[in-house]
Regions:
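… and, occasionally, acidic/histidine-rich disordered N-termini of signaling adaptors
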Residues: 1-149, 201-215
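C-terminal catalytic subdomain
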Residues: 62, 82, 138-150, 155-215
Length: 215
C-alpha cells in the first residue's frame, strides 16, 4: 500500500520478475518531496529494473543503482532502499538494505517479531568505494505463515494531533494483532491503526507498506 502525503510521492515500491524461480521486491524513500523527489525516484526505478534482470545478488543490484544515480543526485538528497530477492523453490530471501528502515520478520511458529538489520549505506551519498564495501547480501529463510514486512519511515513517524509519533511499538502491536489474517490482514490493520492515530492531522510524509508472506 502507498499513501502519498502529496499528489506526487517520494516513496517507491516495485515487484520485478527476475526469472521463473526468482522475483524482486523493492521499497525506497527519497529525501525530499514533490516533483524533484519523484524525478529521482523515476530514474531509480528505471536503473533498478534494468539491473535486476537475471541478477540473484540484491547487493550487486543496489551497487549498480548507486553507481548510476550518484552523479545525478544533489548533495542534499539521497535514497534509502531495501531490495529483496525471493527464491520460490527454497523460500529463501536475499536482502540488501541501503540505509533503509530495518525490515521486520514475523515468525509464525513462536509469534515473534525481529528487525532484520544488516549494514548498508543510502544511495547517492558515496560514489561506490564505501557503498560497495558496506552494502552486502543478507539471507534468511521463510517458513509457513512467516511474514517479512517492508515499510518507509512514514509509518513509524506518522504524527498525531499532539505531535507524537506512531512508533515501532505500535507497528509491532498491529502486526501481532493481525498476523493470523495473513499479509492482507496486516496491511489492513496497520493502515487502519495509522489512520485512527493520525486522525484529522495532516499527513506529513509518504507511507508505504509491503508484506511478504510464505504460504
Amino acid at each position: 500500500v502507498n499513501i502519498p502525503a502529496r499528489h506526487v510521492s517520494g516513496d517507491y515500491y516495485d515487484y520485478i520478475g527476475i526469472d521463473e524461480e526468482h522475483c524482486g521486491i523493492a521499497i525506497a524513500d527519497v529525501s525530499g518531496k514533490g516533483v524533484p523527489a519523484s524525478l529521482i525516484m523515476a530514474m531509480c526505478r528505471s536503473v533498478l529494473r534494468s539491473q535486476a534482470a537475471g541478477q540473484h545478488s540484491a547487493a550487486r543490484v543496489l551497487q549498480q543503482v548507486n553507481a548510476q544515480l550518484f552523479p545525478d543526485i544533489r548533495e542534499d538528497m539521497f535514497i534509502s532502499m531495501a531490495y529483496a530477492i525471493l527464491d520460490r523453490n527454497s523460500s529463501t530471501v536475499t536482502l540488501c538494505r541501503a540505509g533503509h528502515d530495518a525490515p521486520l520478520l514475523y515468525r509464525a511458529k513462536d509469534r515473534t517479531i525481529t528487525k532484520v538489520n544488516p549494514p548498508g549505506m543510502a544511495v547517492g551519498i558515496d560514489s561506490g568505494g564505501v557503498f560497495n564495501r558496506v552494502t552486502n547480501d543478507f539471507s534468511l529463510s521463510l517458513e509457513s505463515d512467516d511474514c517479512l514486512i517492508l515499510y518507509t519511515d512514514g509509518v513509524t513517524e506518522a504524527l498525531d494531533r499532539q505531535g507524537a509519533e506512531f512508533g515501532m511499538e505500535n507497528v509491532i502491536r498491529s502486526i501481532l494483532a493481525s498476523a493470523s489474517e495473513g499479509a492482507a490482514g496486516i496491511i489492513t490493520k496497520l493502515t487502519d491503526d495509522l489512520r485512527a492515530f493520525v486522525g484529522a492531522h495532516p499527513q506529513h510524509d509518504d507511507i508505504t507498506l509491503i508484506v511478504i508472506r510464505k504460504k
